[in-house]
């Protein structure tokens, strides 16, 4: 630090001039400069000194590189560097996309770069603790505060560098390197847009994703061969010929909700889906579904079995109608399960009102293997046509005996009045899973689900009744062709319009 002594007067003068300094960093830098400032570098590097020093000195800046920095700086640098053979240092080859062999030619510095480079070198030597980013900010602020006369030496130096650069590289053309990150971002965006398209069948699969334990439980109980792996991975929709047709429409229905990160689609609120649009495309290729596929949409574990208040809609995920707005189908099947079920177990939910008992002349013994088929159809029709009772269709939950399921499956072709989805040949697929359905009813302790599931028999998957019927009042029923008496429309409740069930027969 003995270098400092001869220049104490100079630093005192600088400190006087620094009283109006715009930035504390710069004032400290210039004040503590350990090297002679006669070269004019201090004058250029910090704004406030220009009134202390003669105006002619900044012109020295344009001279050779040696004069740019104070003597002590040059000596120290040469002392450090003299031991190195710089021919051994590899050239900093910055690859310029097209020609990988040529070193990258930098652009000529503009006036600010000339100023910033000289000032940064000086300040970095004096104050090594300064953070480079803060230094850059301060240099930029100072540059904006300089007036034209103060900037002139840097502007002239920059012009000289530009002319020199043009001589050295006559065919130079500025080619900024492209950022690779932009490409990655685009690729990510493309992936995201690919993910946002859902096939129409993902709608059905999305019901399975209501809750993780329910999806795994249902898939393992009902179709262990097919769906036991579904609980671990994301639901994969079955491929159908018309997958792309619906993708755009379903996109709109999703209301822009992105896919969950884990790969599970969010459960779809079918209040927003127009069944008019769905039925045309989805129903047309519904024939490619295996009937076991639908078992996973039976009620998940977490859902209540009984709607609490009249008119409240609970989406149970089953294809039965879960709203208490009564329909002929629900009325018929609720009373059907009431008629054939054993006495209710003690753990019946308290909020379910006791459903009125069916008339005694229509009682069928629970264990009777062959009930009169015509009487069953008559039971359904008469019960659903009693408006006073069907107004009270609070579903009663009770356990059903296995014979109830087998009876329903034997008679399922006779219940076509409620299953226009004409699938008598699907009924053989039910008996293998009769026991597991019964077990599941035990766990759930809610026979109301199975009043739809098994009571409806082959009509279980008909007509997409998982749409809340109170919000889809756009249909009128099609009379069925099976010879069973049709649903009487005159006695149906007034506040609910009849839905049209599209009649589907598998070829």
Curated annotation (Swiss-Prot):
Residues 42-52, 378-420, 483-507 have a biased composition (Polar residues). Acetylated; acetylation impairs nuclear localization and ability to transactivate expression of target genes. Deacetylated by SIRT1. The modification Phosphoserine is found at residues 64, 211. A motif (9aaTAD 1) lies at residues 275-284. It is found in: Nucleus. The keyword Transcription regulation applies. There is a cross-link at residue 396 (Glycyl lysine isopeptide (Lys-Gly) (interchain with G-Cter in ubiquitin)). Residues 392-507 are annotated as: Transactivation domain (TAC). PANTHER family: SOX100B, TRANSCRIPTION FACTOR SOX-9. This is Transcription factor SOX-9. The lineage of its organism: Eukaryota, Metazoa, Chordata, Craniata, Vertebrata.
């Amino acid at each position: 630090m003995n270098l400092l002594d001869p220049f104490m007067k100079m630093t005192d003068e600088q400190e006087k001039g620094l009283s109006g300094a715009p930035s504390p960093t710069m004032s400290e830098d210039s004040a503590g400069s350990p090297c002679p400032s006669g070269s004019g570098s201090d004058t250029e590097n910090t704004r406030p000194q220009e009134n202390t020093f003669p105006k002619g000195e900044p012109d020295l800046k344009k001279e050779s590189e040696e004069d740019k920095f104070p003597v002590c700086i040059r000596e120290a640098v040469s002392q450090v560097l003299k031991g190195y053979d710089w021919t051994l240092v590899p050239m900093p080859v910055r690859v310029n996309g097209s020609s990988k062999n040529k070193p990258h030619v930098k652009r000529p510095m503009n006036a600010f770069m000339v100023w910033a480079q000289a000032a940064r070198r000086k300040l970095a030597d004096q104050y090594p603790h300064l953070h480079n980013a803060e230094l850059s900010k301060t240099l930029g602020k100072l540059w904006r505060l300089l007036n034209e006369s103060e900037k002139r030496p840097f502007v002239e130096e920059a012009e000289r560098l530009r002319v020199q650069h043009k001589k050295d590289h006559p065919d130079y053309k500025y080619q900024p390197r492209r950022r690779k990150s932009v490409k990655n971002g685009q690729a990510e965006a493309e992936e995201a847009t690919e993910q946002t398209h859902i096939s129409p069948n993902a709608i059905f699969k999305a019901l399975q994703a209501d809750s993780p334990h329910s999806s795994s439980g249902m898939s393992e109980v009902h179709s262990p061969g097919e769906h036991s792996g579904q609980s671990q991975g994301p639901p994969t929709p079955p491929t159908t010929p018309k997958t792309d047709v619906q993708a755009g429409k379903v996109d709109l229905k999703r209301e822009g909700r992105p896919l969950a990160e884990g790969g599970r689609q969010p459960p779809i609120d079918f209040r927003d889906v127009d069944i008019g649009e769905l039925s045309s495309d989805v129903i047309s290729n519904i024939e490619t579904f295996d009937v076991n596929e639908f078992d996973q949409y039976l009620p998940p574990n977490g859902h209540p079995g009984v709607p609490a208040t009249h008119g409240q809609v609970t989406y149970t995920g089953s294809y039965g109608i879960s709203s208490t707005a009564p329909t002929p189908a629900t009325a018929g099947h609720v009373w059907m399960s009431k008629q054939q079920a054993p006495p209710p177990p003690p753990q019946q939910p308290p909020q379910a009102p006791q459903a009125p008992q069916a008339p005694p002349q229509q009682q069928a013994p629970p264990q009777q293997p062959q009930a009169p088929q015509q009487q069953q159809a008559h039971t359904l029709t008469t019960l659903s046509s009693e408006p006073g009772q069907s107004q009270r269709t609070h579903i009663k939950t009770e356990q059903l005996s296995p014979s109830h399921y087998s009876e329903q499956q034997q008679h399922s072709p006779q219940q076509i009045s409620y299953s226009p989805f004409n699938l008598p040949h699907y009924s053989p697929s039910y008996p293998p899973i009769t026991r597991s359905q019964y077990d599941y009813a035990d766990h759930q302790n809610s026979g109301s689900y199975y009043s739809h599931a098994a009571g409806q028999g082959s009509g279980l998957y008909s007509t997409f009744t998982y749409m809340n019927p109170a919000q889809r009042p756009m249909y009128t029923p099609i009379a069925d062709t099976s010879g069973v008496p049709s649903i009487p429309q005159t006695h149906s409740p007034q506040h609910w319009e009849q839905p049209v069930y599209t009649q589907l027969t598998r070829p």
